[in-house]
Protein backbone atom coordinates (compact mmCIF):
# COMPACT_ATOMS: atom_id res chain seq x y z
CA UNK A 1 0.00 0.00 0.00
CA UNK A 2 1.09 3.58 -0.55
CA UNK A 3 2.57 5.79 2.14
CA UNK A 4 0.12 7.77 4.24
CA UNK A 5 1.54 11.16 3.37
CA UNK A 6 -0.63 11.83 0.33
CA UNK A 7 -4.05 13.46 0.54
CA UNK A 8 -6.37 13.32 -2.46
CA UNK A 9 -9.25 15.74 -2.94
CA UNK A 10 -11.82 15.32 -5.75
CA UNK A 11 -11.12 17.87 -8.47
CA UNK A 12 -14.85 18.51 -8.76
CA UNK A 13 -14.67 20.30 -5.40
CA UNK A 14 -12.43 22.92 -6.99
CA UNK A 15 -14.68 23.37 -10.01
CA UNK A 16 -12.53 21.42 -12.50
CA UNK A 17 -13.66 18.85 -15.04
CA UNK A 18 -15.30 15.69 -13.79
CA UNK A 19 -13.19 12.61 -13.22
CA UNK A 20 -9.91 14.43 -12.49
CA UNK A 21 -8.26 14.60 -9.11
CA UNK A 22 -5.88 16.93 -7.26
CA UNK A 23 -3.09 15.30 -5.25
CA UNK A 24 -1.66 17.37 -2.41
CA UNK A 25 1.71 16.09 -1.20
CA UNK A 26 1.88 16.24 2.58
CA UNK A 27 5.24 16.90 4.21
CA UNK A 28 6.57 18.47 7.37
CA UNK A 29 6.60 22.01 5.99
CA UNK A 30 3.62 21.96 3.64
CA UNK A 31 0.88 19.89 5.25
CA UNK A 32 -0.82 22.69 7.15
CA UNK A 33 -0.56 24.96 4.12
CA UNK A 34 -2.09 22.17 2.03
CA UNK A 35 -5.00 21.81 4.42
CA UNK A 36 -5.56 25.56 4.33
CA UNK A 37 -5.62 25.45 0.52
CA UNK A 38 -8.18 22.65 0.59
CA UNK A 39 -10.34 24.60 3.03
CA UNK A 40 -10.08 27.69 0.84
CA UNK A 41 -11.22 25.69 -2.20
CA UNK A 42 -14.16 24.32 -0.27
CA UNK A 43 -15.01 27.83 0.90
CA UNK A 44 -15.17 29.00 -2.72
CA UNK A 45 -17.45 26.09 -3.58
CA UNK A 46 -19.68 26.87 -0.62
CA UNK A 47 -20.14 30.51 -1.55
CA UNK A 48 -20.09 30.11 -5.33
CA UNK A 49 -16.83 32.06 -5.61
CA UNK A 50 -18.64 35.29 -4.81
CA UNK A 51 -19.26 37.37 -1.73
CA UNK A 52 -22.58 38.59 -3.14
CA UNK A 53 -25.78 37.09 -1.74
CA UNK A 54 -27.24 35.95 1.54
CA UNK A 55 -25.10 32.82 2.01
CA UNK A 56 -22.89 33.24 5.13
CA UNK A 57 -19.17 33.41 4.46
CA UNK A 58 -17.34 30.24 5.57
CA UNK A 59 -15.13 30.47 8.63
CA UNK A 60 -11.93 28.43 9.09
CA UNK A 61 -10.84 27.63 12.64
CA UNK A 62 -7.76 25.75 13.86
CA UNK A 63 -8.09 23.84 17.15
CA UNK A 64 -5.16 22.22 18.96
CA UNK A 65 -5.85 19.14 21.04
CA UNK A 66 -6.04 19.47 24.82
CA UNK A 67 -2.77 18.04 26.24
CA UNK A 68 -4.36 17.58 29.68
CA UNK A 69 -6.96 15.21 28.26
CA UNK A 70 -5.03 13.50 25.43
CA UNK A 71 -3.69 10.06 26.23
CA UNK A 72 -3.52 6.40 25.29
CA UNK A 73 -4.63 3.04 26.63
CA UNK A 74 -2.54 -0.13 26.49
CA UNK A 75 -4.32 -3.47 26.66
CA UNK A 76 -1.99 -5.66 28.73
CA UNK A 77 -4.28 -8.72 28.86
CA UNK A 78 -7.82 -9.64 27.86
CA UNK A 79 -9.24 -7.79 30.87
CA UNK A 80 -6.50 -5.40 32.03
CA UNK A 81 -5.40 -2.02 30.75
CA UNK A 82 -2.88 0.72 31.45
CA UNK A 83 -4.26 4.23 31.04
CA UNK A 84 -1.98 7.23 30.41
CA UNK A 85 -3.74 10.59 30.24
CA UNK A 86 -2.26 14.06 30.25
CA UNK A 87 1.00 15.23 28.73
CA UNK A 88 3.81 15.97 31.20
CA UNK A 89 7.51 16.79 31.16
CA UNK A 90 8.24 13.06 30.76
CA UNK A 91 5.30 12.10 28.50
CA UNK A 92 4.83 14.15 25.34
CA UNK A 93 3.43 11.64 22.88
CA UNK A 94 0.54 9.22 22.46
CA UNK A 95 0.74 5.74 20.99
CA UNK A 96 -1.34 3.77 18.49
CA UNK A 97 -0.71 0.28 17.15
CA UNK A 98 0.88 -2.91 18.44
CA UNK A 99 4.22 -3.03 20.26
CA UNK A 100 6.35 -5.47 18.22
CA UNK A 101 8.20 -6.63 21.36
CA UNK A 102 5.40 -7.15 23.90
CA UNK A 103 2.59 -7.61 21.37
CA UNK A 104 0.36 -5.37 23.48
CA UNK A 105 -1.91 -2.94 21.64
CA UNK A 106 -2.16 0.81 22.22
CA UNK A 107 -5.01 3.09 21.21
CA UNK A 108 -4.56 6.87 21.29
CA UNK A 109 -7.22 9.37 22.34
CA UNK A 110 -7.32 13.05 21.38
CA UNK A 111 -9.65 15.74 22.70
CA UNK A 112 -10.39 18.93 20.76
CA UNK A 113 -12.55 21.51 22.59
CA UNK A 114 -15.30 22.95 20.38
CA UNK A 115 -16.44 25.75 22.69
CA UNK A 116 -15.14 29.28 23.07
CA UNK A 117 -14.27 31.98 20.58
CA UNK A 118 -11.93 29.75 18.57
CA UNK A 119 -14.28 26.76 18.52
CA UNK A 120 -17.23 25.70 16.40
CA UNK A 121 -20.72 27.05 17.20
CA UNK A 122 -23.29 24.40 17.99
CA UNK A 123 -25.52 25.53 15.12
CA UNK A 124 -22.71 25.74 12.56
CA UNK A 125 -22.99 23.96 9.23
CA UNK A 126 -19.80 21.96 8.66
CA UNK A 127 -18.13 22.41 5.27
CA UNK A 128 -14.98 20.37 5.95
CA UNK A 129 -12.79 19.06 8.75
CA UNK A 130 -9.25 17.68 8.69
CA UNK A 131 -7.19 16.09 11.46
CA UNK A 132 -3.38 16.30 11.33
CA UNK A 133 -0.90 14.44 13.54
CA UNK A 134 2.89 14.53 13.49
CA UNK A 135 4.44 11.06 13.35
CA UNK A 136 7.31 11.23 15.83
CA UNK A 137 8.47 7.64 15.34
CA UNK A 138 7.51 4.20 14.09
CA UNK A 139 8.54 1.00 15.87
CA UNK A 140 10.10 -0.90 14.17
CA UNK A 141 11.47 1.70 11.79
CA UNK A 142 10.73 -0.47 8.75
CA UNK A 143 7.19 -1.28 9.88
CA UNK A 144 3.89 -0.13 8.43
CA UNK A 145 0.48 0.22 10.03
CA UNK A 146 -3.02 1.00 8.70
CA UNK A 147 -4.67 3.60 10.92
CA UNK A 148 -8.35 3.96 11.80
CA UNK A 149 -9.78 7.14 13.37
CA UNK A 150 -13.03 6.76 15.30
CA UNK A 151 -15.34 9.42 16.71
CA UNK A 152 -16.00 8.64 20.38
CA UNK A 153 -17.33 10.41 23.46
CA UNK A 154 -15.45 9.79 26.70
CA UNK A 155 -17.43 12.16 28.93
CA UNK A 156 -16.61 13.38 31.44
CA UNK A 157 -13.29 13.60 29.61
CA UNK A 158 -11.47 11.12 31.84
CA UNK A 159 -10.19 7.93 30.22
CA UNK A 160 -10.94 4.56 31.78
CA UNK A 161 -9.42 1.24 30.74
CA UNK A 162 -12.50 -0.10 28.97
CA UNK A 163 -12.54 2.93 26.64
CA UNK A 164 -10.03 0.83 24.72
CA UNK A 165 -12.83 -1.55 23.75
CA UNK A 166 -15.08 -0.69 20.83
CA UNK A 167 -17.89 -2.64 22.51
CA UNK A 168 -17.61 -0.62 25.74
CA UNK A 169 -17.11 2.74 24.00
CA UNK A 170 -18.84 2.33 20.62
CA UNK A 171 -17.71 4.66 17.83
CA UNK A 172 -20.14 7.15 16.30
CA UNK A 173 -18.31 6.85 13.00
CA UNK A 174 -14.89 6.03 11.57
CA UNK A 175 -12.53 7.00 8.75
CA UNK A 176 -9.23 5.55 7.55
CA UNK A 177 -5.92 7.26 6.88
CA UNK A 178 -5.18 6.94 3.17
CA UNK A 179 -2.43 4.33 2.88
CA UNK A 180 -0.37 2.73 5.62
CA UNK A 181 1.76 4.88 7.90
CA UNK A 182 5.39 3.98 7.12
CA UNK A 183 8.94 5.13 7.82
CA UNK A 184 8.47 7.76 5.10
CA UNK A 185 6.00 9.52 7.41
CA UNK A 186 8.37 9.87 10.37
CA UNK A 187 8.89 13.55 11.09
CA UNK A 188 5.98 14.47 8.83
CA UNK A 189 2.34 15.33 9.36
CA UNK A 190 -0.29 12.79 8.34
CA UNK A 191 -3.66 14.28 7.48
CA UNK A 192 -7.06 12.60 7.37
CA UNK A 193 -10.42 13.93 6.24
CA UNK A 194 -12.75 13.77 9.27
CA UNK A 195 -15.58 15.83 7.80
CA UNK A 196 -18.14 13.06 8.30
CA UNK A 197 -17.08 12.66 11.94
CA UNK A 198 -17.29 16.40 12.61
CA UNK A 199 -20.77 16.54 11.09
CA UNK A 200 -21.84 13.67 13.35
CA UNK A 201 -20.33 15.39 16.40
CA UNK A 202 -22.39 18.49 15.58
CA UNK A 203 -25.54 16.43 15.15
CA UNK A 204 -24.99 14.84 18.56
CA UNK A 205 -24.25 18.17 20.22
CA UNK A 206 -20.81 17.08 21.46
CA UNK A 207 -18.93 19.82 23.32
CA UNK A 208 -15.60 18.20 22.40
CA UNK A 209 -14.43 16.46 19.24
CA UNK A 210 -12.89 13.27 20.62
CA UNK A 211 -11.25 10.53 18.58
CA UNK A 212 -9.77 7.11 19.19
CA UNK A 213 -6.80 6.39 16.90
CA UNK A 214 -5.97 2.72 16.46
CA UNK A 215 -4.60 0.11 14.10
CA UNK A 216 -7.29 -0.72 11.57
CA UNK A 217 -9.32 -3.87 12.08
CA UNK A 218 -7.81 -6.96 10.48
CA UNK A 219 -4.54 -8.92 10.71
CA UNK A 220 -2.08 -7.39 13.21
CA UNK A 221 0.84 -5.43 11.81
CA UNK A 222 2.96 -5.39 15.01
CA UNK A 223 3.95 -1.78 14.38
CA UNK A 224 3.64 1.05 16.90
CA UNK A 225 3.08 4.67 15.82
CA UNK A 226 4.30 7.46 18.11
CA UNK A 227 2.28 10.68 17.73
CA UNK A 228 4.00 13.90 18.83
CA UNK A 229 2.06 15.80 21.52
CA UNK A 230 4.50 18.28 23.11
CA UNK A 231 3.87 20.80 25.86
CA UNK A 232 6.93 22.84 24.86
CA UNK A 233 6.76 26.36 23.33
CA UNK A 234 6.66 24.87 19.82
CA UNK A 235 3.40 23.01 20.56
CA UNK A 236 1.38 25.11 18.06
CA UNK A 237 3.64 23.86 15.26
CA UNK A 238 3.75 20.19 16.34
CA UNK A 239 0.63 19.22 18.28
CA UNK A 240 -2.40 17.38 16.87
CA UNK A 241 -4.53 19.88 14.97
CA UNK A 242 -8.18 19.95 13.90
CA UNK A 243 -9.01 22.36 11.08
CA UNK A 244 -12.72 23.00 10.59
CA UNK A 245 -14.44 25.08 7.93
CA UNK A 246 -18.03 25.99 8.75
CA UNK A 247 -20.84 28.40 7.99
For the regions a protein language model found, what residue spans apply to each?
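Bacterial N-terminal signal peptides that target proteins for export
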Residues: 5-35
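C-terminal motif of bacterial Sec signal peptides marking the signal peptidase cleavage site
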Residues: 43-46
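N-terminal leader/pro-regions and domain N-caps
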Residues: 48-92
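Proprotein-processing/basic-patch segments
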Residues: 50-64, 76, 199-247
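A short beta-strand-loop element at or near the start of a globular domain
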Residues: 78-137
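Residues within well-ordered beta-strands of beta-sheet-rich folds
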Residues: 109-113, 120, 125-134, 191-197, ...
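Extracytoplasmic/secreted cell-surface and envelope-processing proteins
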Residues: 121, 139-144, 219-227
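Beta-strand-rich interaction/scaffold domains
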Residues: 138-207
Amino acid sequence: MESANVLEIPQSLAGASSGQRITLLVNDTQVRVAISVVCALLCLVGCGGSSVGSVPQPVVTHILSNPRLDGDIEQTSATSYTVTQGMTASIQSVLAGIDPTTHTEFRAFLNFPLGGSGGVPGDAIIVSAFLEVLVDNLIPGNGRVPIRVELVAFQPPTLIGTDFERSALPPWGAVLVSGDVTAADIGHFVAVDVTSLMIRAQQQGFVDFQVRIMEDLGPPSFTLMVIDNPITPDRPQRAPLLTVTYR
